[in-house]
Amino acid sequence: MLTAVTGIKWGDEGKGRVIDLLAERADIVVRYQGGNNAGHTVVTKQGKFILNLLPSGILHPNVVCVLADGMVVDLEHLSNEIADIRGKGVSVTPQNFKLSARATISMPWHRIQDDLEEERLAQSGVAFGSTRRGIAYAYSDKYRKKTLRLGDLLHLDEPYIQVRLKTMLEAKNLELAGCYHQEPMSYPALLAWCQKQAKEFLPYICDTGNYLDTALSSGKQMVLEAQLGAMRDIDYGIFPYTSSSTTIAAYGPIGAGIPGVQPDHVVGVLKAYSTCVGAGPLWPRTLCLKNGRNPCARPAVNMALQQAAHAGLGHLMRLQAGTA
């Protein structure tokens, strides 16, 4: 059975707690989109855990956790997160944690670009409230085909991978030097970084799509864990104040690598009052439009608010359920 858990506001709805409860009866928990811009908080007898990349099910010893195809993975952050929870007595091994070979690597320059661009925008008062963890830049380079996937770490000795690395680095050095006046990065340093990540994570990398498909066919209980909420969805959120991935439940099987499967259950999580991390309008402000008042002087934000009000939260909820 497949259950998808997603947020139907701006994130921070409490999905981590819900998934932790569902994981008690699950065999597998899968994150299918986003990166380490998530912040799922779970409190157990072992302490308080704030999980940015690891699925919430990692705290359950009999649950297998997967970072699937639709993810962008900051491997340095993941290494630190694994070390942190191991220090609290949580086991993380290739038997209970798997990385998709198709997941995108968040390269070292993605965080640098994100930080520099957010600083530049902040000087003009138009910053997006980015987490500065390189998520947008990792997804951008995914669609430009100018980054690596985790499976590429298996083939760093292959000439075609080395040529791709050199080509990527040349382009990034032009961007960083031309736009932000940064010192160029060297190819030997980049290759050494990739080799270091490969040494640590090769045992975890596999065809997770095949693994999940086989597990479902054998009757395993699976939970899909979304990051953020519908109002941060790249297509259905309040653009441009969105994340860079598809957060709704309908994308869950695609991002998980099992695109032919439909969730048996969809759990939409919300809380009684609205909060969000980052810049952009909150849904309650749309009430001002009904009273003829202008909640914000910026036309772009007004347009986004009107579009959101017209679409309606009900439409987003139908999208989550796959009935729209």
Tell what function each PLM region has.
Residues M1-A324:
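Non-transmembrane, aqueous-exposed alpha-helical and coiled segments at domain scale
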